[in-house]
Amino acid sequence: MGDSIKVLSENRQARFQYEILETYECGLVLLGTEVKSIRAGKVNLRDGFARIRNGEAWLMNVHISPHESTNPSYNHDPLRDRKLLLHKQEIRKLVGKVEQKGLTLVPLKLYLKNGRVKVSLGLARGKKLHDKRQDLKQRQDKREMERAMKQR
């Protein structure tokens, strides 16, 4: 029996803005209305990041839209901080890397794995402007090469 994975949201902008060094799979502590909205695909990871406070990992600035068919008084705050579920050793390892090397934790994708919502967290270093330009140029050159090969 393999793991059934369904990607619900992907942060493509993160791969452009950051150089991803390592990835971690984390669970999330969510409310019921948040799970319903996530399953409906109403989530935006673009501005999200993770922080470690008091030995706990927190996902911040990720927008999960309120569920439509739920009474507004029972709905959740779209931008609330959400706790990430990681092992203590992983958190300790991340603290050292984030504080000493000046790296950032960025959510890369949100997915369902065996019915549970997981987030793929990337340990990332910010790219400089010339690195971004170089990536764009390489992508454009690759596209042109493929186009030329197709015309033959």
UniProtKB/Swiss-Prot annotation:
Places the protein is found: Cytoplasm
Sequence ranges of Basic and acidic residues compositional bias: 132-152
Signal peptide: none
Coiled-coil ranges from the UniProt annotation: none
Region annotation (Disordered) ranges: 130-152
Record bears the keyword Acetylation: no
Keywords tagged on the record: Cytoplasm, RNA-binding
Family annotation (InterPro entries): SmpB (IPR023620), SsrA-bd_prot (IPR000037), SsrA-bd_prot_CS (IPR020081)
GO terms for cellular component: cytosol
GO BP terms: trans-translation
One annotated GO molecular function: RNA binding
PANTHER family: SSRA-BINDING PROTEIN, TMRNA-BINDING COMPONENT OF TRANS-TRANSLATION TAGGING COMPLEX
Function: Required for rescue of stalled ribosomes mediated by trans-translation. Binds to transfer-messenger RNA (tmRNA), required for stable association of tmRNA with ribosomes. tmRNA and SmpB together mimic tRNA shape, replacing the anticodon stem-loop with SmpB. tmRNA is encoded by the ssrA gene; the 2 termini fold to resemble tRNA(Ala) and it encodes a 'tag peptide', a short internal open reading frame. During trans-translation Ala-aminoacylated tmRNA acts like a tRNA, entering the A-site of stalled ribosomes, displacing the stalled mRNA.
Family: Belongs to the SmpB family.
Name of the featured protein: SsrA-binding protein
Native species: Thermosynechococcus vestitus (strain NIES-2133 / IAM M-273 / BP-1)
